[in-house]
């Protein structure tokens, strides 16, 4: 049995800059000089199938997007993600809505021809570890916002807060947070006899 040499999403060193998230003035300044990853219905923008497609905050592809979410500092570069799922691609380029994997690619008219929205499962191994981490984080947090638009306490519409890492209810004051706890999957192996222990619980 060969042990993995690298662990996906493990130890990339991305500075999440949690202390800056609640400062709206600082976030505005970071966004102005930052880069944004557009995400369409869970698919990140990708260049030539091998790299994430970062754009400037004022790019036309973001015109109909929701509020950006701060992902963190990648060195000195502030990274954000923005949900543009309300954009409708031209006829014939729709996503495959059923099944485990969507092989379709959507191209926005405001982007170069080698830029497209692709299913993360299909490109994960082509991305750098940092790119894979940022894409997975963007997909997860934006999906959380789309599926948690209403307060679980009173049912009123909630609002994005703290640079995208909280939803606040203006009606009852409740605060809601995404799940960010780590998950570990283990496999018990008997190397000498080439066996694994299966169980459920």
Please state what every model-predicted region is.
Residues 1-127:
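N-terminal alpha-helical interaction blocks
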Residues 51-54, 132, 167-171:
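Short Pro/Gly-enriched beta-strand edge/turn motifs at strand-loop
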Residues 137:
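Phosphate-interacting basic helix/loop segments used at nucleotide- and nucleic-acid interfaces
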Residues 145-148, 155, 166:
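Residues immediately within or flanking Cys/His clusters that coordinate Zn2+
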Residues 156-159, 177:
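Short functional micro-motifs and their immediate structural scaffolds
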Residues 160-166:
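Short linker/helix segments within small regulatory modules
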Residues 167-201:
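N-terminal strand-loop-strand
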């Amino acid at each position: 049995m060969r042990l993995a040499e690298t662990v996906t999403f493990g130890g990339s060193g991305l500075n999440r800059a949690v202390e800056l998230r609640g400062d709206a003035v600082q976030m505005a300044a970071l966004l102005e000089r930052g880069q944004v990853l557009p995400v369409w219905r869970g698919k990140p923008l990708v260049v030539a199938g091998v790299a994430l497609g970062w754009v400037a905050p004022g790019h036309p592809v973001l015109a109909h997007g929701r509020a950006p979410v701060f992902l963190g500092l990648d060195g000195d570069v502030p990274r954000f993600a923005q949900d543009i799922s309300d954009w409708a691609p031209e006829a014939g380029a729709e996503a495959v809505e059923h099944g485990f994997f969507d092989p379709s690619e959507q191209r926005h008219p405001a982007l170069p021809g080698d830029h497209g929205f692709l299913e993360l499962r299909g490109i994960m191994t082509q991305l750098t570890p940092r790119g894979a981490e940022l894409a997975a984080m963007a997909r997860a947090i934006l999906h959380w916002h789309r599926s948690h638009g209403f307060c679980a306490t009173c049912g009123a519409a909630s609002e994005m807060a703290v640079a995208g890492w909280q939803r606040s209810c203006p009606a009852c004051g409740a605060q809601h947070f995404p799940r960010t706890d780590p998950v570990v999957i283990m496999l018990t192996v008997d190397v000498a006899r080439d066996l694994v222990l299966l169980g459920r619980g």
